[in-house]
Amino acid sequence: MTKPTFYITTPIYYPSDKLHIGHAYCTTIADTVARYHRAKGEDVFFLTGSDEHGLKIQRKATEMGVTPIQYVDEIIANFKLLWQRLNITNNDFIRTSEERHHKVVQSILQKIFEQGDIYKKNYEGWYCVPCESYWLERQLVDGKCPDCGRPVERMEEESYFFKLSKYQDRLLEYIETHPDFIQPVARRNEMINFIKQGLEDLSITRTTFDWGIPVPFDNKHVVYVWFDALLNYFTGIGYGSDPEKFNKYWPANLHLVGKEIVRFHTIIWPIMLMAMGEELPKQVYGHGWLVVEGDKMSKSKGNVIDPLALIDEFGADAIRYFLLREINLGSDGNFSRDALITRINADLANDLGNLLHRTVSMIEKYHGGVIHKTACSDPLDDELIALVNETVAKYQDAMDHMEINTAIKALWALISRANKYIDETGPWLLAKDPAKAARLETVMYNLAEVLRIVAILTSPYIPSTSPKIYTQLGLTAPEQFLLADTAWGGLPDGTKVQKGEPLYPRIEITESGETVIAATKKTAPAAKQAVKAEVKAEAKTESKAAATEEITIDDFMKIDLRVATILTAERVPKTDKLMKLEVRIGEEERTIVSGIAQHYTAEELIGRNVIVIANLKAAKLRGIESRGMLLAASDGEGKLVLADAPDIASGSKVK
């Protein structure tokens, strides 16, 4: 049976400067969509590339004393490196300087010229070099380019023109009768209004520079950048050289572009296709811009983010997840390091990473690492399984409509529900009752099965993480995760888990602004002295416990005692007594450092419901801010016993 095809493209990037996070944003979106459609079982072709011609490139190369091709070659190598580091799965990388592309452009230009849709005349107007665009006086904004706001240059030259105006009414009718052609809706409305103002014929050749594709019918001219660049979508799938491949993938399912170039893709490109007698792409989606800390990226502001450095610091999957989760695709999005670290710690480390760690740890502890598929159901199980099925449906609907962060939110709601399911079922209590052995097996299976399905659904977003989840569950990750495998019950009986390293260690920011892995954080000498002082103060307080001053009921009422669920536990490095705990108090998560490391192992603590003082003033212990204190009693031999609340919901007030 022939697979459905899905052809997706990014814009081809202009190699005029260094890489920035915006390049990573658009290509990560496209890769995610491509991976999703592969997971649906479709035959996907994913094209990206570089737009290498034009006056701007020629000027840059001249400034640097190199040829244009030498100038762009180095930048293109960095593009390809970035795509590799981000795990981008493009099928081809098209360069407009390649001979295969020159042939396509020249053959199409000749065809349109011969049918009378191209004519020559002298042209005078205002030219924006960075945008490679001519503008009329009335189109300028305060005398500057209406697209980028930069100064324009007055130019006059002989040029060939393409008859955009001839196809204006036909294009407008097409857009109005095909509501999905331009998305989101705001971009569609902008383009309709633009066309209704009247289209000018388009200058498509230049004589003022020679770094471009020669015009086949007049060797004094080279092809204007946009008429050249847009045809990459044909070259990449074999137009003129591989008819079978071209007919297989055209028309494109999705052109993903930044909002600033929607006009070129929804006016010039479809009119070119109409003139060629070719079908139009099914959709052009204009995503928003990525700003940094609320400001547009610029070298003058010093806020251009290097994506390669970011990947070195946080890892590709964390960057991909943040870009996809944090930003509504059709709107502008804000990048900040604080928001990135918050997402890593809250979503990836606490929610997903902790669910896997707790589940695998309990399967090892209670069942020797073996997953048992036992039928001992409970209404809680039915609710969880129903949510899984509902989530898969919501996820697919959102992804099909390019609502990527909506799909991720639905998926993380399932992850949160699975974490809550642990608290509700209390595996540590079931393990104490031999009569509930079958129930414990069912709970463990359900948690592992949720994680298996989560691994499949997250594979388009965090593709390096999904195989790690499979490995820890004792499964072999497939070469291609498939949505068809998300049906409940696919985890085989008898599977043996393989506990591994945390998926995402928590990230902390030092006082100097450096990021460190929480588990390996080193304490500076000054901080060590502060900790010693804090410990001495605590010891003095404890020694005077018997003679503590009496308090009133009003004093006692100031103490906010709450039930908290311990999410993660790890020893504080270079200490014997301190344990760093991540706890959930209702909907809030916080860190508490407690001196219980000699009395409980991390495994014994994870998943436990304990009582904490929730309104204790924050204090730093070993450089870690602790917000709260666990209640525990001490026996005659000095052993600490925690005040547990196993059957009370997290966040409940203790009175």
Give the ranges of each region predicted by the language model.
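Conserved, charged catalytic cores of large soluble enzymes
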Residues: M1-K18, A30-L202, F234-Y239, P243-K245, ...
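Intrinsic disorder at enzyme termini
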Residues: I469-D555
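Short, glycine/acidic-enriched loop or turn micro-motifs at the edges of active sites
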Residues: G54, L231, R571
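Beta-strand segments within the central parallel beta-sheet cores of soluble alpha/beta enzyme folds
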Residues: Q283-G286, Y470-T471, K580
